[in-house]
Amino acid sequence: MYLVVCWGRVTGNMISTRHCFSRCKSRSVRVIKATAMLFVAAMLFLALHMNFSHEASQQNLHRAAPISSPTTISRSTVQIRNATHDFLPASSTPMKDELIETESEFVDGFQRNEVIACSDTSEEFRTDSKRITLVNSQSGVPCPIRPPALAGRFVPSKKSSTYHELAAMFPDVQDGGHYTPRMCTPAEKTAIIIPYRNRCRHLYTLLPNLIPMLMRQNVDFTIFVIEQTTPETFNKGILFNAGYLEALKVDNYDCFILHDVDMIPIDDRNMYRCNKMGPVHFSPGVNKFKYKLFYSGLFGGVVGFTREQFRLINGASNLYFGWGGEDDDLRNRAVHMKLPLLRKTLAHGLYDMVSHVEAGWNVNPHSKGAHSLYDMLNKALGVQAGWNVHPNSKWPLRLFDSVNHAPAEGAGWNVNPDRFKIYSTSRQRQHVDGINSLVYNVTWYRTSPLYTWVGVGFNKTVITNSIPEDLRIGPEADNTYLTGNFTIIS
């Protein structure tokens, strides 16, 4: 019932009741609909913990220039390194040298901006084509399996330190981010590979927690920050492979720890050592999942391979542009080569994830707010345990695919909508997709007292075309990635 009185604005006469009610009802419906839409939108943003970027001021520092087309590219482009080495499998087919379509102006500009953003001064870095010289331990005493200096579980610092604070904090870390214990000789040399783009705050939150933990563990380590410098969608697998190859140009490392920049360890009994039996998953328990294993096949966050293991599986896939699928594909590669999967116990393999407050409106489908949404769905449906909506199931992720239309971190860290189809061809393309097919160039190589910083450029078309077309993507999605058989180790 609409109890309204409408008056003519021109004649001053009363408008017909029917016309009045019709017009007022139409306006009321529009107002109600608009209000409802605003309410739903507000609730959705609240539930999913969407965040505005407080780092938007840095976004311009990392804004990439468009890649020139093949018709306009000049011969001043950077010549690609041949990524094929003598330690690759005998079945590997060497790739010819390629030209990466990266304008030198873009490379130089990106290089300067990154140094300013993450060190405040370019004087702290030096460019050295001869690489770093490692100084190893002179002690003949083997390091103990369980060092006495371990503190156990600790409360990590969530403060993002400055470059100068970190450099002063760790004077024993040598140029290039290398450290070796003085009182004993470690059993292996370890390369920490950190894939990176536009995550200064995360990097400088990770390092003040990671470095002292590695020191207490008597790890002989070198930290490599591998940054994607081209404006392609972020590809973590390519950075893993490039980091592996570039690290081997520094030293013949025994162990490679592939470490997400936002994963902060909180227990130093989680020893950063590789295992000759098989690859190790170091991070089963993360705070956003209440320190419980998210799903049985989880292989993301922090993982470790020996040099031979990573070579045997042909490294990581180069085809996953965007979020999702690359870690599960990496796990499958080990399974295909009959390597047993090892996982640290939940008593020690614990991590806190740095809050993702990035530029753009992207939603992390595994955020706390997202899990609250799944909980509400499950309660509302009143279904049995076997019918619950899994946070990693296919249809909820489509919701995030549609929401994540804006680029994350100003660089395109979006959900990959084809990740399950790419995953379906994992076994068939493993021998042709990886370190033996990687085409990339080193846009810069810089060392500092904290890390070795390597800029990596690549072209998506060149990367994709290096794989046979029938092996790049399958016709149907494969959702079997949720399962995995692991042996728990301490």
Swiss-Prot record:
Membrane topology: Single-pass type II membrane protein
The encoding gene: GNT
EC number(s) from the headed UniProt entry: 2.4.1.-
Name of the protein described by the UniProt record: Beta-N-acetyl-D-glucosaminide beta-1,4-N-acetylglucosaminyl-transferase
GO biological process: carbohydrate metabolic process; protein glycosylation
Localization of this protein: Golgi apparatus membrane
MF terms (GO), sorted A to Z: galactosyltransferase activity
Residues modified by glycosylation: N51, N82, N441, N459, N485
